[in-house]
Amino acid sequence: MRIVGLTGGIASGKSTVSNLFKASGIPVVDADVVARDVLKKGSGGWKRVVAAFGEEILLPSGEVDRPKLGQIVFSSDSKRQLLNKLMAPYISSGIFWEILKQWASGAKVIVVDIPLLFEVKMDKWTKPIVVVWVSQETQLKRLMERDGLSEEDARNRVMAQMPLDSKRSKADVVIDNNGSLDDLHQQFEKVLIEIRRPLTWIEFWRSRQGAFSVLGSVILGLSVCKQLKIGS
């Protein structure tokens, strides 16, 4: 199975690319969706986060007020690192199970959409790595327009993440999203061809079909050995 790593930065257009993969019929494991699930009221992640940040981050329903929590962690490096440390084990296990589900369903190619792909060292498990890149100027402009943030707040959120230039240097494939939506679509079509190329032997053996092939070969080999033993 080919596990494609997709990452970018806030307001880079990564979610748009993720949706394009979905529309093309390629399964996507979304770390943000997993993160929302592990923060649901009463979950292990919810308990640890509430214990660390207090009940003031909760809505009247008891669910985490995500915008409020975001304001807290984006204004403090130490609090952001604490949140990442608390959530990492739950998110990693959640992503693993989602990948396992796709493997069990017979998927040959999947995309793992992880904003912190390099930061949490998940890049070692994905190939190729696709980075959606924009200039910092474009990133700030889009973030302010999208979320109605001041330049200072937008800059704090951008600076809280690994620089996109650093991510670009580690990528196998770079999608430059500084242009129009049409430009993005044209680049995506080229990426799609790369993603859908035939599996390597290693990728094939990691797939469900490859595992069944190995199992079938073992069973056949044992059967032949048994017949030879009986005939001797």
Curated annotation (Swiss-Prot):
Pathway this chain belongs to: Cofactor biosynthesis; coenzyme A biosynthesis; CoA from (R)-pantothenate: step 5/5
Stated role: Catalyzes the phosphorylation of the 3'-hydroxyl group of dephosphocoenzyme A to form coenzyme A.
Main location: other
Lineage of source species: Eukaryota, Viridiplantae, Streptophyta, Embryophyta, Tracheophyta
GO cellular component assignments: chloroplast; peroxisome; vacuole
Species of the source: Arabidopsis thaliana
Gene Ontology terms describing biological process: coenzyme A biosynthetic process
Keywords, in A-Z order: ATP-binding, Coenzyme A biosynthesis, Kinase, Nucleotide-binding, Peroxisome, Transferase
Every DPCK domain range: 3-206
Enzyme Commission number(s) from the entry: 2.7.1.24
Matches recorded under PROSITE patterns: DPCK (PS51219)
Catalytic activity: 3'-dephospho-CoA + ATP = ADP + CoA + H(+)
GO molecular function: ATP binding; dephospho-CoA kinase activity
Location(s), subcellular: Peroxisome
Keyword Nucleotide-binding: yes
PANTHER family xrefs: BIFUNCTIONAL COENZYME A SYNTHASE-RELATED (PTHR10695:SF46), DEPHOSPHO-COA KINASE-RELATED (PTHR10695)
NCBIfam families listed in its UniProt record: dephospho-CoA kinase
Domain of life: Eukaryota
Pfam families: CoaE (PF01121)
Protein name: Dephospho-CoA kinase
Residues reported in the UniProt entry to bind ATP: 8-15
Family: Belongs to the CoaE family.
SUPFAM superfamilies per the UniProt record, alphabetical: P-loop containing nucleoside triphosphate hydrolases
